[in-house]
């Protein structure tokens, strides 16, 4: 991948989040409006419009929502709930948005970790965010290995992508959860003044 392509992708993600922030301002007076509410509203309005374009793949809002619902239902089955924090260490790709959106649907805060972070720095970010678990791309397992000795306490680790011995894999064949949208009441305790994600 050349530098121009990489910068273009980063800018696209930046614009995506700027649009979310811009839209959320119009909902400031509504106590229980969250970014997940806004995104689900857009899904319902334009389900067949393209939401994500990545390399040679395109995903409609309906498809994006279904993938996110699968993550949300997986997290529910694992016992995660509003107020919990999960760290996400993954390259910029559609699965990143699916995972983040899915967790936001049930009120889980995502600690977005830079995929260049390793060793003590990675362990520090996980500790600082008070993450209960880590979802990591299989291509970034070396990052985790370099931080393992510095991570305090128990940290549940789920791997997205290829199978890695000793870890639970987070992919379609392993998740096998419903793509039906979870009830928004699962995040009703949230307000739009609470943290959606942390960025490290």
Go through each PLM region and give its residues:
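Flexible, non-catalytic linker and terminal segments flanking ANL/adenylate-forming cores
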Residues: 1-32
């Amino acid at each position: 991948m050349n530098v121009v392509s990489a910068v273009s992708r980063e800018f696209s993600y930046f614009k995506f989040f700027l649009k979310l922030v811009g839209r959320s301002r119009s909902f400031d007076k509504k106590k229980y409006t969250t970014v997940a509410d806004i995104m689900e509203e857009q899904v319902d309005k334009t389900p067949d419009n393209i939401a994500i374009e990545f390399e040679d793949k395109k995903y409609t809002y309906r498809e994006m929502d279904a993938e996110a619902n699968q993550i949300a239902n997986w997290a529910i089955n694992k016992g995660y709930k509003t107020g919990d924090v999960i760290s996400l260490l993954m390259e910029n790709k559609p699965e990143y948005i699916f995972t983040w959106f899915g967790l936001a649907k049930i009120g889980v805060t995502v600690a977005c970790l830079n995929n260049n972070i390793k060793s003590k720095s990675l362990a520090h970010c996980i500790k600082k965010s008070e993450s209960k678990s880590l979802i990591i791309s299989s291509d970034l397992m070396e990052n985790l290995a370099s931080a393992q000795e510095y991570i305090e306490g128990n940290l549940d680790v789920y791997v997205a992508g290829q199978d890695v011995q000793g870890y639970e894999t987070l992919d379609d064949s392993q998740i096998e959860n419903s793509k039906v949208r979870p009830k928004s009441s699962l995040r009703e305790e949230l307000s739009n003044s609470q943290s959606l994600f942390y960025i490290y």
